[in-house]
Amino acid sequence: MRMFFDGREMGVSNKNEIMLAVDNLVALHRAGRTVWQEVDRDMQIREKNDVKRRNREMKRVHNYIAKQSPKREFESLFMQAFPYFYEQGLNCEQAEAGTAGESEHMGYCHGTYNHHSVLVCGTADARYIATINFEKYHIGNQLQDLYYFIRKTVEKNGYAFALLTAILERYQQGIPLQQMDVAYICGLYRYPEKFYKLSNQYMNGSKTRISPKMVEKLNRIMEEEEKKQTLLEKLSSYNISKK
């Protein structure tokens, strides 16, 4: 059975709607945790964050491009950027190996919770949020949903640290967070997600003609890297327990 909602996508620059989306995520996670604990505890938990596999895929793309001669603009830029981003991936792999298994945040996860999955419905007097796009719904660490929402939303707002902390504090009003949870989110964010996805896009796309947009995307990733690292530096020293 399908349900249809008369609404629009959440305004990714509208702070009020962002906070409504966080409240909605809290409700989703509470329900998802209860169902998993009381009904589906024996169901398989998805591997939390397969960094090792992703790193292998990035290395495979690197090895493929290394053999190309002559190299086109995207391929040359990729080879220049690869050592920096691959090192980030390896650091994340080592950090992941040292993390504990099951977390108190285990439960059903949305999988792709961002502004495209949140509809603002109703009128100004009777507004409500609807959640869509459950294709990647699974059992896992629900903090991955929170991280994904933070990353997508913060990057659309110029890597604003104040917005990131506002999201964390709003989430904590409904589901308590500890310092280790902030460290976990920070660890997820350190992975070079955009570079990894672009490498996959290259590998799965046409090699006959590489779109100029690929070069634009890679340049943008490198240009935004300083903002990302500044944000992560602030997040790593952020104390959630004092909020």
Q: How would you name each of these model-derived features?
A:
Residues M1-D40:
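ATP-binding pocket architecture of kinase catalytic cores
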Residues L177-D181:
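Helix N-cap / loop-to-helix initiation motif
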